């Protein structure tokens, strides 16, 4: 059981980690080291011996091992990432890097993804140290860099260059592994993450005929691009069920007394309520336009 001090530390650590701006815009501009040092200091306070590891200066990862009571048991990896996606202060009612506690809530970028979990990991380990608690199995604790971009400086680097640190790990709990599904009826579902969706980035470029904004132009590059982007955003890709997803759908259907229909998953998704968005992303590919850029002057049609 968590003591009150551990609960207070979760709030404190979340707030303080948020105040360390680790925005990852891609391109290697992020610096997680201050947050990594913060986490390492608190791990050391729990009697652990954390390692700080970098592929690129400033892109720091933290790894520590908690010895379990049963050396024959498989180890468990518990991990979180230290970087966050960027935030524009003008879009927030509370500054995104203030870590302000208001109305019983911690506000800021990372409060959900995922400095909150980083803080919980740290607080639990420190609480165990105070209470003299040891887990049955070894725990490998990892706080990684670069999750919000390529992961080349984070988990990719650790897996490629330091696999020995994860020796014996057979399962992991992280941002999505052991994620709880809530279907809106009070039912809690605990899925097992067996893999990740692949990712591809595409750049779509449209050309046209340049001209003055006061004249009709049926070869407008902006409207051509907008039409293409709309089609991409509205397109529903066909079902594509991997063997792992089929197994998951079979188990989910059984929870509701249904037979899994691999040709029509709509009924099952409807049963899942709020959790449907998480499951729907596993049954088909998807494409989302995220950035647009066009023109250079308000009265000039770009070519």
Regions found by a protein language model. Give the residues of each.
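Acidic/histidine-rich catalytic neighborhood of metal-dependent amide-processing enzymes
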Residues: 106, 112-191
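Acidic-enriched catalytic cores of C-N bond-cleaving enzymes acting on peptides and small amides
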Residues: 163-170, 177-187, 193-201, 213-292, ...
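Catalytic cores of nucleotide-enabled group-transfer and carboxylate-activating enzymes in metabolic
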Residues: 38, 294-296
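Predominant activation on well-ordered alpha-helical scaffold segments within soluble catalytic domains
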Residues: 15, 40, 119-126, 156-159, ...
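A generic structural motif
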Residues: 112, 147, 208-214, 296
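Fold-independent oxyanion-binding glycine-rich loops
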Residues: 80-82, 175-177, 206, 292
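Acidic/His- and Gly-rich active-site-bordering loop/insert found
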Residues: 2-109, 118, 128-137
